[in-house]
């Protein structure tokens, strides 16, 4: 008997969206030199049958069966709706970064979808940061360049996520015009003990600044890491040292109401 796994997964995805099982979490980013709120990254969890399923479990499945664009759009629309609410409550809007999968970024309807969402929720594009990964770019550099140019024309911020985890990081900086570079956690795990690691980190930050690219250090967990990043003028920090990913309501209470 042939089992149509894609059909089953698609039905679960639709049901999950209808029942609000997919929950948005926000992890704040902070300016390194001041410690003030700089923005946040939108992350998603699946509250399935009372259990919280992490994205590393379900995202690969949605990608495998080419259903990820539905989830991408769901997250992006939720962030646009959230920013609309913040504006009505007269909160100061901070940029929220949203991951863009390869299938979504290269979809022929991608730009029209972005325009529709911006118009529907009256969102300023420069408060939305669209993240692409090295894998996305490597798959098709020309399509990635075209997508980057198109979203920039609309006014969105473009960032490179998980920088340093692939094999062509520096080549991508040459080909893709990004605004923000997110250095992967692996750079900083042993940074205080690794002279070679420090040289590489400092070179990446210096090079990025010369290209007018801001740098976010991801996965920061200790005070010593923070002090080091201050000294080398990294722009922003994200990690458990400051805050874990939290629900939207908690983010608003802790950061937006007093921002």
Language-model regions: role of each:
Residues 1-5, 32-33, 49-51, 101-108, ...:
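EAL-family c-di-GMP phosphodiesterase catalytic domain
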Residues 81, 112-116, 143-153, 199-206:
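Alpha-helical scaffolding segments of alpha/beta enzyme cores, especially the outer helices
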């Amino acid at each position: 008997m042939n089992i149509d796994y894609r059909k089953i997964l698609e039905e679960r995805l639709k049901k999950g969206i209808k029942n609000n099982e997919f929950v948005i979490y926000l992890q704040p980013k902070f300016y390194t030199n001041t410690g003030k709120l700089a923005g946040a990254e939108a992350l998603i969890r699946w509250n399935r049958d009372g259990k919280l399923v992490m994205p590393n479990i379900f995202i690969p499945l949605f990608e495998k069966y080419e259903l990820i664009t539905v989830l991408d759009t769901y997250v992006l629309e939720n962030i646009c709706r959230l920013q609309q609410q913040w504006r009505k409550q007269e909160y100061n809007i901070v940029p929220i970064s949203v991951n863009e999968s390869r299938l979504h970024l290269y979809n022929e309807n991608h730009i029209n979808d972005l325009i529709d969402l911006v118009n529907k929720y009256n969102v300023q594009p420069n408060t939305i940061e669209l993240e692409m990964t090295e894998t996305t770019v490597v798959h098709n550099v020309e399509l990635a360049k075209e997508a980057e140019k198109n979203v920039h024309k609309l006014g969105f911020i473009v960032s490179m996520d998980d920088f340093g985890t692939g094999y062509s990081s520096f080549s991508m900086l040459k080909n893709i015009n990004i605004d923000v570079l997110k250095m992967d956690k692996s750079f900083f795990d042993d940074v205080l003990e690794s002279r070679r690691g420090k040289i590489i980190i400092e070179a990446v930050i210096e090079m990025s600044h010369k290209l007018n690219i801001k740098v976010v250090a991801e996965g920061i967990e200790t005070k010593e890491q923070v002090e080091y990043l201050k000294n080398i003028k990294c722009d922003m920090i994200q990690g458990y040292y400051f805050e874990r990913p939290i629900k939207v309501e908690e983010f608003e209470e802790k950061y937006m109401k007093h921002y």
